[in-house]
Structure formats: C-alpha cells, structure tokens
C-alpha cells in the first residue's frame, strides 16, 4: 500500500460527522444550506458538472423548494487517508429517491470521492465528486429535474 496513511480516530469521527451532516441536509429539505459545508474554494462535481460554492448555493436553493421529493442516502466503506494537510476520502453510497421507479430500489449506487480541509477548527469539503456506478441515468435525470425546477 503506497502512501497509505490512515487518519486518527478523532479526525475520522469529525469527517464522518461532516459527511453525515451533508447527507442529512440533502435528505431533510435543507439543501439550501449545504454550501456552508464547503471551503471558500470548494467544488462539487457530479451530474450537473462542476459547481463552485456559489453555484452550489444556487442549486441548493432550487432543491430546497422541491419539498415533495423524498430521498435517503446510505453510506459505508469510508476510507480516509492523509494527503499533506488535507484528507482524501472515498465513501460508498446508496441513494433511494421516490421519483425513481420502483422507489424501493436504489436510484443510484456509487462513491463520493472527496477531499477535506480543516478551516477555523472545522472540517470542510474542498472537493466532492459524485461518481454513480449503477443508476447513473437516474442520477442525471434527477439533476435535470432540479435544474429545471420540476419536482416529479
């Protein structure tokens, strides 16, 4: 294992709390606040392309208005390693969404490839890349609905 330098327990817990907070906000109609979890130079990469912090803020405002969409994210297999002063993370995810047919089957399965940096004593996302492995078409369709301002 080249350059394998796992994080200490405290760092792991703090970053896992950051990840959980992001997903909680997405799943509980608080997407308009997710931009706060990024560094000033933070970016999100996914079905909508690359979004900086301000673009994420605008996206979140649209998504938060779509209160009839229900989603739940489940994560596991969290791998966190030091990379200089930042931490690199790989998080396996499973997303359910009621706009996916049938809603009891995952809308998307994949991984979040992330980088984290501590700013003013708090861990924040520097980069968050959403990489669907299964269900990529469903993820892209959902992103298009949010962009268009539609709910279902």
What is the predicted role of each segment?
Residues 136-152:
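Acidic/histidine-enriched, glycine/proline-rich intrinsically disordered or flexible terminal extensions
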Residues 88, 109-141:
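Short beta-strand edge/turn micro-motifs at domain boundaries
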Residues 31-95:
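A solvent-exposed, acidic/Ser-Thr-rich amphipathic alpha-helical stretch
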Residues 1-37:
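Short, low-complexity N-terminal intrinsically disordered segments enriched in polar/charged residues
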Residues 73-75, 107-112:
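Short, surface-exposed coil-to-beta transition loops
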């Amino acid at each position: 294992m080249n350059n394998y330098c796992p994080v200490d327990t405290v760092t792991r817990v703090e970053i896992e709390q950051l990840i959980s907070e992001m997903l909680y906000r997405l799943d509980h109609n608080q997407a308009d606040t997710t931009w706060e979890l990024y560094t000033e130079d933070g970016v999100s990469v996914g079905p909508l392309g690359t979004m900086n912090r301000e673009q994420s803020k605008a996206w979140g405002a649209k998504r938060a208005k779509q209160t009839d969409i229900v989603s739940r994210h489940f994560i596991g297999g969290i791998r966190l390693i030091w990379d200089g002063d930042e931490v690199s993370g790989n998080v396996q995810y499973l997303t359910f969404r009621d706009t996916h047919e049938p809603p009891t089957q995952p809308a998307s399965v994949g991984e979040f490839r992330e980088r984290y940096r501590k700013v003013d004593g708090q861990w924040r996302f520097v980069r968050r890349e959403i990489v669907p492995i299964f269900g990529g078409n469903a993820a892209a369709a959902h992103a298009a609905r949010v962009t268009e301002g539609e709910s279902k």
